[in-house]
Amino acid sequence: MERIVTPAEMFEDGNSELSLRPQKINEYIGQDKVKERLNIFIKAAKNRKEALDHVLLYGPPGLGKTTLANIIAKEMTGDLKITSGPAIERAGDLAAILTTLKDYDVLFIDEIHRLNRSVEEILYPAMEDYALDIVIGKGAAAKSIRLDLPKFTLIGATTRIGMLTSPLRDRFGVLCAMEYYDENQLKEIVIRSAAVFGCKITEEGALEIASRSRGTPRIANRLLKRVRDYSEVKSNTVISLKEAREALELLEVDNQGFDKVDNKILEAIIDNFNGGPVGIETLSYFIGEELGTVEDVYEPYLLQKGFIVRTPRGRIASDKAYKHLGRVNNKNNNSNKGQTSFFK
């Protein structure tokens, strides 16, 4: 069973996310620095009648990378083609996609860090020269021909920028770090989404949902849908603070936005490893989750909120974690010193 607070896309998110996505960059809430830069680059490219330079969006999942790609395509008056690194298994698969593009189209590759090397190398001339090198024949009779491609924009999205090879990363002209949203930004998103859903919500109710949404719009919208269900069944016409709080408690999402898995991680570090340090592989094994899942999904938010600290020797529970679980920290382990951002 998937967690309701997972930032990864769930099956139920698909259709609702499409209806909730803003269509213009000035409608997009949050990520102000990213928006400002992209707005300038888009206007400059349109004034010169050129394709926008290739864009790399990196950061935790659920923060709006696909939405931004859709907005960029609309602003550039092109079509958006969406695929992912794991879906492109062979160089021929990518070549087939590239040859269907038109001028100013946007090719969005999610999880671009998972492209295999042979596929990645096809991208190099496509990104630099808008060209596709194809080898015809085999052995001594083989020859290479170059096909011209339209002036397109590649947008890559990744949660693991460190896993990108330098040659690929260096070919992106625009790099944008996506950051977690603050509660006021998420409150705006919840109020906007409620209007799209056709339900009424008070500012206090929206803020309560926002405060438990882990800084992630996807989670905020998902929680809003479940709170709406609760409110409708209880015959309430407006989602108030009371209804929002009751529904979220029923969903077992606490006031930090943590669920059982998050608290299990904190409990493991404190109760089973004496507050740490503990290696991420050991911790992953202990809680029964894959290493990549812990690094990509669970750890970033705990780091961002300052509940765990990443040190050269492993993960340490901070004083906030002890207080959250009602434990007393008797260790002098400098638990508030170390790396508290996953993307530094």
UniProtKB/Swiss-Prot annotation:
GO terms for cellular component: cytoplasm; Holliday junction resolvase complex. GO terms for molecular function: ATP binding; ATP hydrolysis activity; four-way junction DNA binding; four-way junction helicase activity. Mg(2+) binds at residue 66. SMART domains: AAA. Residues 1-181 are annotated as: Large ATPase domain (RuvB-L). GO terms for biological process: DNA recombination; DNA repair. Residues 182-252 are annotated as: Small ATPAse domain (RuvB-S). This is Holliday junction branch migration complex subunit RuvB. Has 3 domains, the large (RuvB-L) and small ATPase (RuvB-S) domains and the C-terminal head (RuvB-H) domain. The head domain binds DNA, while the ATPase domains jointly bind ATP, ADP or are empty depending on the state of the subunit in the translocation cycle. During a single DNA translocation step the structure of each domain remains the same, but their relative positions change. The gene is ruvB.
